[in-house]
Amino acid sequence: MNKPLIGAFFAALLLGAGITPAVAAESAQAQESATETAPAAKAVTFSGTVALSNCSGSVVRSPDSQPTDPALVLSNGHCLETGFPGPGEVLVDRPSTRTFTLLNASGTGVGTLKASKIAYGTMTDTDLSLYELTSTYEQIETSYGIKALELETAHPVAGTAITVASGYWKRTYSCDIDGFVHQLREGRWTWKDSVRYTPECQTIGGTSGSPVIDDATGKVVAVNNTGNESGQECTDNNPCEVDENGEVTVREGINYAQQTYNMVPCIGIGNKIDLDREGCGLPKP
């Protein structure tokens, strides 16, 4: 896991996949065909990202979220202030007063957002946390002129150009989605269908929880979480890949993220997390 940078205990456990703040991506030239013109890629900025005390994150919304809904902040399960959730552990609706520094497009902190609760958190099958804030999307936009990042609803595609935007470091990393991992194992934890980056995304500690943004759409397709630091096999800070046949592969220096499309159906009316909703792919307690 990407080190959350909060002390010796967590530093020893969290791996340093550092996601640099998303550098503005160059606009892709529209490719014309006989029938259609593809849209130009959007420049990725820090707008909507947040800095936690130990990690990175972002203010996110589902396509159905309303302006008056309490806003959500997305980060990693291993970034929770309560510590690492154990294998099989799922947190739902836990009170929280955690604060987040909201960043504008250039990476400047413009205000402080406050959580009312940990709406969801786990390190089982995926590595994510969702905080519900005391502010609505409308209040955040009115106060700071910043909109939430939208979550993609479809499975990402290999070869997609992406940017990892770290609010903690105010740095970005740009690369492509290299492929997907059946099971990614690290220490006691196993994550499913993880995103593997091409080598250009050399994320470091503190980038944990950074949004992984599709350069073409500006939507969040994953949340950055780990990387193999020293070539060890399946140990803390050295995840290994396990395919459908049980074959283990170690890729030293390669970093990974967890997909987020499967959590979108879990976000119900009023931005409440409902694990029983149709299509919800998050583990239950």
PLM features per residue range, with description:
Residues 80-83, 228-230:
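Short glycine/acidic-enriched loop and turn motifs that connect beta-strands
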Residues 2-72, 82-84, 88-94, 265-285:
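Protease-domain processing segments flanking chymotrypsin-fold serine proteases, especially trypsin-like
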Residues 63-70, 107-109, 185-191:
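Short, solvent-exposed loop/turn segments that connect beta-strands within catalytic domains
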Residues 108-116, 158-161, 170-185:
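Beta-strand/loop subdomains of soluble extracytoplasmic proteins
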Residues 43-55, 138-146, 171-264:
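Active-site region of chymotrypsin-like
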